[in-house]
Amino acid sequence: MLIGVPRELLENESRVAATPKTVQQILKLGFDVIVEHDAGFKASFEDQAFLEAGAKIGTSAEIWQSDIIFKVNAPTDEEIAQMKEGAALVSFIWRMQNPELMKKLTAKKINVLAMDAVPRISRAQALDALSSMANISGYRAVIEAAHEFGSFFTGQITAAGKVPPAKVLVIGAGVAGLAAIGAANSLGAIVRAFDSRPEVKEQVQSMGASFLEIDFKEEGGSGDGYAKVMSEEFNRRAMELYAEQAKEVDIIITTAAIPGKPAPRLITKEMVDSMKPGSVIVDLAAATGGNCEYTQAGKVVTTENQVKVIGYTDFPSRLPTQSSQLYGTNLVNLLKLLCKEKDGNINIDFEDVVLRGVTVVRDGEEIPPAQIQVSAQPKQETKAAPVAEKKESKPTDPRVKYGVMAGVGVLFLWLASVAPAAFLSHFTVFVLACVVGYYVVWNVSHALHTPLMAVTNAISGIIIVGALLQIRQPTGNLFIDALAFVAILVASINIFGGFRVTQRMLAMFRKG
């Protein structure tokens, strides 16, 4: 089958649905690829790069006659008219916001797979295009804020004076919010975050931000991987928190969105008016109405008190090269599910929950949204397990303890009387090493067990040296040789395993 990649026609859209790297992966699945002339130009992908990857370059008319169309945005009426019956379209569709588009797609009798309908389950993460684009949006939001902000993000002490670090508030700790937290923290800002889902607190803190909480308990998870609409009391408390923080912070990044509905209004004009001059608000929900009252989609609004409100709706397109690569990889991973035989043909198997979830039109028939349980469920209240009755243990007779100690003492005295002086010296050191080693190892933090394993390589090396010396003894005692061989084998396992674990540990601290 032939896969066509057209040029995106929307204004300010710089992405493309395939890159030279993803073309190579598609060809390995048995498909042919044709890319429209200059489709990847805005994303820094020349036609020559696609040709070298194995694709063909064609006209718009040739592209839309392909068996499968890979696209970023939903098609226009003219593009739909050019598609042939029975073809497959893979792109963002947004069926709930575009009922008229769905009617036109079903009338064409084609198959439509919506990348915005990927189920939020673990197995579908590799093709979750929404998360890929949200990650880029969160990162780019910080870059845009830094561009408009008139100072450093990180604090500095210079000969000219002290520069305080910027304070950043991120509202919403989803994929975009976490990306914004990471980017702002890496630039040296003091980052705070709020989310209605208490289960994301650890994620926020692990990214280096402070998690803000309100004195009101309400479960924020909706069971579909998104935050649910909260009660009026919760929203009132949250608005009080936003108003308090607005007076302190320099930058606010809002990411709150409700699928298929207008974005919730979180930042009022009064809050913006209370912010310091030069502050910046980045509204990632501008496309669906915005979280801020001052937001205007696609524009930067400067208020009377010199606060800039950024309402761009094309954050992923502002990083077109990376966005195209991630989106193209998502499409390749979807194609692997559609073409498990790698024979260049697709099979929309509804037994696969992922394919069932993304399919919105099949053979001209609109498919209702699938009810798929998400992998990340909100925490359920656990019932306390019944406490088992404790059986009273009888106290140990102290005479038994003293008897054991006396027996050990007698055994040691006997060994001291019959054993050579060298053995007694080594035995004493061995006993002391066991006692000291026990208390040292068991008092080490769990986080340091991996580095501790690396240190044991040296100890195992000493064991191997001792065992090798025993094997070389002229007596030729078979029992001693066997024990020495076992010691070498066990110590070698510890050494090789220790080096392997150490290598993996050190790799965690390398970039790239």
From Swiss-Prot:
Keyword Membrane (UniProt): yes
Stretch list, region Disordered: 375-394
Periplasmic side: 473-478
GO cellular component: plasma membrane
The protein's role, per its UniProt record: The transhydrogenation between NADH and NADP is coupled to respiration and ATP hydrolysis and functions as a proton pump across the membrane.
Name of this protein: NAD(P) transhydrogenase subunit alpha
Binding site for NAD(+): 125-128, 175, 195-197, 225
Species of origin: Haemophilus influenzae (strain ATCC 51907 / DSM 11121 / KW20 / Rd)
PANTHER family hit by this protein: NAD(P) TRANSHYDROGENASE, PROTON-TRANSLOCATING NAD(P)(+) TRANSHYDROGENASE
EC number assigned by the record: 7.1.1.1
CDD domains in the cross-refs: Rubrum_tdh
UniProt keyword terms in alphabetical order: Cell inner membrane, Cell membrane, Membrane, NAD, NADP, Nucleotide-binding, Translocase, Transmembrane, Transmembrane helix
Gene this chain is encoded by: pntA
One Pfam family cited in the UniProt record for this chain: AlaDh_PNT_C
Enzymatic reactions: NAD(+) + NADPH + H(+)(in) = NADH + NADP(+) + H(+)(out)
Family: Belongs to the AlaDH/PNT family.
Cytoplasmic side: 1-400, 443-451, 500-512
